[in-house]
Amino acid sequence: MRFLHTADWHVGKKLNGFDLLAEQHDAFLKINQLAKDYKVDAVVVAGDLYDRSVPSEEAVEELNKDLIRMNLKEGWPLLAVSGNHDSAVRLATGGAWFKATNFFMHTTVAQAIEEPVTLGDTQFFLLPFFGLQEVRNYFGDPEIRDLKTAMARIVAKMEEEFDPDRTHVLVAHFFAAGSSHTDSETQTEVGGLDAVPVDLMAPFDYVALGHLHNKNALQAPRVKYAGSPLKFSASEVNLDKGVWIVDTQPFNLQWVPLEPLHDLVKLTGSFDELATVEYASHYQEDDFFVIELTDTAPIPDLMNKLRHYYPKIIALSRVNKAADQSHLAAPAQDLENKDPLALLSDFYHQVTGEELSDNQRQWAKDALLAAQKEEEG
């Protein structure tokens, strides 16, 4: 059979405060079209359907439309697991109902082991993001203390359910040993329980992973991250985004890129080079920008000036950070003796070219006082 492997949709996510629902809607329409173009038999979503465990109404509406389009309108079986950003309990609501339309949403270890999904020549095991306590409870073994042991027990139990006449695919959401991550996954998110050694997954013919946003995060021929369909942080600016098309018999793997509605673009140059209508005209106004300046002198109100040309700046830095901060240099003794509020005020002025307002100054005083009290116990 042939299926499409995608993951880490993060519906409702914002990119440094900028809403992404329009970009996500466009990406899902394109995924839907790819599924039609490649005549897939099923669609796999390997976790993190939502960006938050309690998503916004707009995010829920968007995901519902996308799932209905794929499952009810196009008729593709959907195989999905909950990720660490999802609420397993909320996603599980309606599970029995979904199953009647070939929408399989697994949110527990018990489901992953006891309810493999057979479609055509393939048996799918759908393993959600899990905590060690859930695995201890399932096996009745309090000695399971790390992810490697937990996964070894889970995979061994899954093997007992293998149909020898079928291909076996694991759909999961975790951090695999040897993977690299990007800034849109924090250490706690990717590290969570530590890592799963790749060799533990050897019994499976293919492992469709979610959790990391880079398709190249792991170099294993049959263990793949799909990555996210959009760029979700400055560190992802050069990453390819797309989906895997997987054929089971004979096995074949094809990467198909997705063209974003609005791209995340990195610009490097001096302020005078970048802050012109001519330079900005090479890009869509609604693109997202990571800007790296080569200037060394301070530029008052820098961000606002750049946003006149590039409204959606998500990150701003200098090529020469040491030179950038040279105008802020002061003897260590002077810094130690200076009032924290004065330091903050100086920094704010250097960055924005403006003075703190009365409200900002009062907020800073309150925050500094609270921090001091907490430090003193």
Give the role of each language-model region:
Residues P55, S82-A208, L212-Q219:
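His/Asp/Glu-rich metal-coordinating catalytic cores
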Residues P116-T118, I245-D247, E292:
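Short, well-ordered beta-strand micro-motif
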